[in-house]
Amino acid sequence: MANLSKTFGEREVAPPEREALVRSVFRRVADRYDLMNDLMSFGIHRLWKRSLAWAVDPRPGQLIVDLAGGTGDVARLVMGADRRVVVIDPSVEMMQAGRGSRKSLVDWSAGTAESMPLPDACVDTLTISFGIRNVTDIDTALAEIWRVLKPGGRLLCLEFSTPAAPLRPFYEAYNRHVIPRLGAMVARHPDAYHYLIESIRRFPDQEEMKRLLEAQRFTDVYYRNYSFGIACLHVASRPGNAG
Ligand SMILES: C[S@@+](CC[C@H](N)C(=O)[O-])C[C@H]1O[C@@H](n2cnc3c(N)ncnc32)[C@H](O)[C@@H]1O
């Protein structure tokens, strides 16, 4: 896992360079990001996100943060008049593409997983959907998530993971051959989608991700596979009593 922070695609890069390259990926794909997600996953990412939103179980008065929230898919599923929902993302372009000109009940704020513009222990629930594999330093990000969560607060992390063995050859062939072509045709940036695929390939599997969370002192850690493990939702709590 530590290696993820030093790679971009198949290249070894220094962490600051990786950060800049990841930013440039999302800057370039922002206007086609939602369309590409629908095409690449046949719309199934929407079902995964609905399941994530259901697990959030929002309550009146809560502060819910959607970290790496991008165009705000998840934030829109959990927003409501009786709670505050904030998207935090370093890409102004992604947030602009999602915000459009519509008024919504979502607040948008620039920030990274490694450094969020929030005081300690203020967040009831933090979601991160297809964002954690983009962060440059996952341990720092998990420590930062811990910092902003209230005691008893929960992290819900939806991410691509390792599918069941019989599915893997088909999944890898699809990722390797189909997605970069779609990226070229639709998003006009095949290299950006090459990075996305490579970052999925290098990301820890379900059990390793669970161990990373436990190593950062999260408790009650469990996960739920979606679509035979193509995606996975990890749920983890900051210990303490929810106030
Ligand atoms: C694959 S998109 C996911 C967007 C959205 N959450 C979704 O599920 O559709 C990844 C997002 O992570 C953001 N990102 C990249 N590096 C980040 C970092 N260090 N901290 C937080 N977000 C980051 C990108 O700007 C991008 O919006």
Regions found by a protein language model. Name each.
Residues L63-M116:
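Class I SAM-dependent methyltransferase SAM/SAH-binding core
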